[in-house]
Amino acid sequence: MCSIGEDDFGDEGATHAMLPGSSATGTVLSAGSCSKCNLASDELYKLNFRAAECQLCFLSYARHKFRAALGAAKALPRSAEVLLLVDGSGASLVLLDMLHFAQTQNTFKRLHCNARVLYIDACGNDSLSSLHKLHERYAPFEFYVIQLNAEPKSLQSLKEYSASIVNATQQELRSLTARQDYGLQQRKRLIGAVAAHLQCSHVFESSISSTLATQLLTSVALGRGGSVALDVALLDDRLQDDIKLLRPLKDLNEQEVQFYVHAQQLQPFTSENELDQSSAASLQNLTSAFVANLQINYASTVSTIFRTGDKIAAKQQTNVDPTTTCTLCHSVLDHQLSDTLLAIEYSRAVSEMGVALQQHDNMEALEQRARQRLTAAQDLCHACRNIQAELTSGNIP
């Protein structure tokens, strides 16, 4: 018989409960000897659960994670055309610096690919000066800019870029949760279209372990459980024209990103958007705040959440017919009449009918109405149908 709880919990409750761990920010120490190369260094980097090491040893360790993620899965063919996404975050600048370093090595260690940089402008010209500084530092790369809701043909080089007014469908959605979810799907669709326009076969995204842990929980909460494996995997093949989305920083944590930014003197810049609002303003913001708190107090728990995503198998698509995928997010459709989805639509139908349910004849019509709602938009998955329901008028473009 299991004895857990007999000795581990006293009169005061969980006396042996998990205690907060070390800070996610780590420590940059003063001068000393590196525990790995034994050389004197002006600055030592102390990661959690790792001995203090010099800057060169730390950079070598972090860059190895980047190369190992790509090499272990053999996800990037030789001489591939790569589109690298930069959003101003520390992680995206780390990815840019790592790729630049990998391409400036000798022939044996060089990462053989041709890279271009894309910045998606969501709020005008606020970040252009920072982008120009990046372009000067990483001159070999071509920089492109496009607005979030613009057509792919409006793509411009950084030197020639000027913002224009575009229509924003997000403002027609009632809740911030729906606007953020729709904006994310639109961003992915735009990235795929731009990659196809530039004839790039692969896209690099700068998601790290804590970001992917947040994405995993958010996807499940939003009803995207069927595609959550691809949302957090190294390789996501849902973009159009067989373009592959790669996440080579998936094994890095926030602490390592902050140290890398400090070591390379990178200057992150962020754009003001809805993600910066109150932590309780949307489901995504609430989940992000929850994971951020875990990262500070229980860093290993975030790793557990993230590693759980690695063990989830992606839903296999037995038919390559485009009609079997969602027109918005390109995930495999889930419109089959399952008990769970039927119960959700039944509950919505009850709320809409209100006092009319007192009539006995309406009970049979209620279930019929719920079934009709499930089959009304067969080209959208469950989560994207929820976005459609949040529109004040019209349909998802």
Curated annotation (Swiss-Prot):
UniProt pathway: tRNA modification; 5-methoxycarbonylmethyl-2-thiouridine-tRNA biosynthesis
Keyword Magnesium: no
Cellular compartments annotated: Cytoplasm
Gene Ontology MF annotations: nucleotidyltransferase activity; sulfurtransferase activity; tRNA binding
Pfam families, sorted: CTU2 (PF10288)
Listed GO CC annotations: cytosol
One of the GO BP terms on file: tRNA wobble uridine modification
Keyword field: Cytoplasm, tRNA processing
Record's function text: Plays a central role in 2-thiolation of mcm(5)S(2)U at tRNA wobble positions of tRNA(Lys), tRNA(Glu) and tRNA(Gln). May act by forming a heterodimer with NCS6/CTU1 that ligates sulfur from thiocarboxylated URM1 onto the uridine of tRNAs at wobble position.
Similarity section: Belongs to the CTU2/NCS2 family.
Designated name of the protein: Cytoplasmic tRNA 2-thiolation protein 2
Species whose genome carries this gene: Drosophila grimshawi (Hawaiian fruit fly)
